[in-house]
Amino acid sequence: MAWLETFTYICGWLILSSCLLVRAQLDSDGTITIEEQIVLVMKAKMQCELNITAQLQEGEGNCFPEWDGIICWPRGTVGKMSAVPCPPYVYDFNHKGVAFRHCTPNGTWDSIHGSNKTWANYSDCFLQPDINIGKQEFFESLYILYTVGYSISFGSLAVAILIIGYFRRLHCTRNYIHLHLFVSFMLRAMSIFVKDRVAQAHLGVEALQSLVMQGDLQNFIGGPSVDKSQYVGCKIAVVMFIYFLATNYYWILVEGLYLHNLIFVSFFSDTKYLWGFISIGWGFPAVFVVAWAVARATLADTRCWELSAGDRWIYQAPILAAIGLNFILFLNTVRVLATKIWETNAVGHDMRKQYRKLAKSTLVLVLVFGVHYIVFVCQPHSFSGLWWEIRMHCELFFNSFQGFFVSIVYCYCNGEVQAEVKKMWTRWNLSIDWKRAPPCGGQRYGSVLTTVTHSTSSQSQMGASTRLVLISGKPTKNACRQIDSHVTLPGYVWSSSEQDCQTHSPPEETKEGHRRQGDDSPVMESSRPVAFTLDTEGCKGETHPI
């Protein structure tokens, strides 16, 4: 099977390499900040100035080419309209539309009456109101989806942590790693909620339209910087969001490494490597996140750092490496499972049943290893169309509900956890039964022996008297009588008053051939008390005369 293992590793590395190359050029959420939008506009401006210089050297024209702050207009023909496609570097533009400008017979661009500003028609570049409303509803649905998902995951993970932490029998290295993973999912959810509150700075179409219509885009680009102290809080929120996001990916990797070592490493000491796993999960992400924060504060300290401009690879590359490595571990683990299935089929087992087991195990591994990450990483970003909307819903669904799925796999469906919960439930029911008074006094749990003595003295005319006598002694060798299942409980003592709760029946024959009298028979003409003793080794609740 060496060829299969080699093929698995080759496929894994090829997929990882291609996905890293694609993902490195893409944004993580399909949106850009104002700073990034300005960078794109400035690059277009520089290219336009080079083109204008080249056109001026070619010769004189009617209307000179120029940069109006958004579009680089070419030479215009006298008395005609010039049409230029809406620029693709403006995010919220209709990239299928066209902008218009008029070249007057005087050889100058038409200007707005009463102003020195050049007239241009950008109406076709702006998204239509119905389209804009549709995009807004789409993003609102995504927000509701991942908010509900992260909330459910947070609650289920919190309960799972309490369950595993409460039962001491569940305290082991494997469950310690699970707890760290649960905490990383919870911190990721909390950081996303905080980030949504304090770092909402994405560029909207209304803001861009107002800048374009007012002609203030160039002034905004070159204007004075604002007070940066107001962005300290949101910068901290963004840094913590990126850190907890990275720790979550790396704790998923730790789970994969732990499972992989259990399968492939002989005599694996999980306790020995626990601190190493903790360093990978919490320590290593802090290194590259701090490096990114220092680079951002030094080179591009603008607004909230919600999305970086060119330095995103500092934290994206390690995260993508963790996703790719986890995917390779997943492939290798599935390969081992498939090999075991084929070996089992060779000895005559049901093939369909074995493949169902393989499919079930693979599904669990998909949730544990986070295989959906590698699937979405390899998908190209189109930022439009039905497929992109479906992809965004699927990606955010799995990302937000993954914590809930992991809690089910590692806690709620875990046999050890279920056994401990059942034990606690049984003990709780027994404690409730002990506190509740029995209806007929027929069941007693304790070490006090109850005896009932009927007096036949001369004072019997005054009525029978009942008293409790503590009797000590060894049980006789009489045969054990069959009693109900409560005798098997520790500390149970059979009481003669239990006959009061039973239906009267004829006396039954004992093994010695004697007949036993029920409690409804006349009082025995004997002054000897009837003692009830508890023998832990022999019969329970045996009676004998003293």
Swiss-Prot record:
Composition-biased stretches (Basic and acidic residues): 506-519, 537-546
Stretches assigned to the Extracellular side: 27-143, 195-235, 296-313, 381-391
Key word Transmembrane helix present: yes
Gene Ontology MF: a single term: G protein-coupled receptor activity
A GO CC term assigned to this protein in UniProt: plasma membrane
InterPro entries: GPCR_2 (IPR050332), GPCR_2-like_7TM (IPR017981), GPCR_2_extracell_dom_sf (IPR036445), GPCR_2_extracellular_dom (IPR001879), GPCR_2_secretin-like (IPR000832), GPCR_2_secretin-like_CS (IPR017983)
Complexes and interactors: Binds to TIPF39/TIP39.
Protein name as catalogued: Parathyroid hormone 2 receptor
Organism of this sequence: Mus musculus
